[in-house]
Amino acid sequence: GVLASRLQRNVRSTCQATGKQAELTIEGANTLIDSDVLNRLADPLLHVLRNAVDHGIEKPHDRAAAGKAATGRIVLAFTRQGQQVVMHCRDDGRGLDHAAIRRRAVERGLLSADQPASDDELARLILMSGFTTRQTINELSGRGVGLDVVREWAATMNGSIKVSSRAGQGTTLELRFAASLST
């Protein structure tokens, strides 16, 4: 519906701004979600998709060099589990740069230089307010606003958010939230 076309436009404009190519597929769009919840979901989803294109999907020549199709794939999948909706946003991009996340976390005093941290623990850091691995700010990112908005949204919806990633293969963001505001 209206939200799906807005999300598609968002991906197209982010691709134009970054010189990348990506195709968005939405699965389970007919999952029963309360319209109030859907309205509140629009902004977080725009952040999630912008992030997938800007940080995940590589430029066409980099994808070709990695043996991938020039056009990246982003799948937004919705499923219902009892009173909850589980949303997965998967991209086939470069995956999280765990080393860059660690460097930034040490610079910001979130980790000490010799403190061990698993990839999952490092992935959780990207959900923190003000966290970015970008050295420069562009119109899309670098301000550290984005996934923390999604994390805060999940908290207000009694939901949860999880990020997992495999180098060179992409990133999956899982968002769980109540299907209706009354539950």
Tell what function each PLM region has.
Residues 13, 17-183:
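Conserved glycine-centered short motifs in functionally critical loops
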Residues 2-16:
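Short beta-to-alpha transition helix within the HATPase_c
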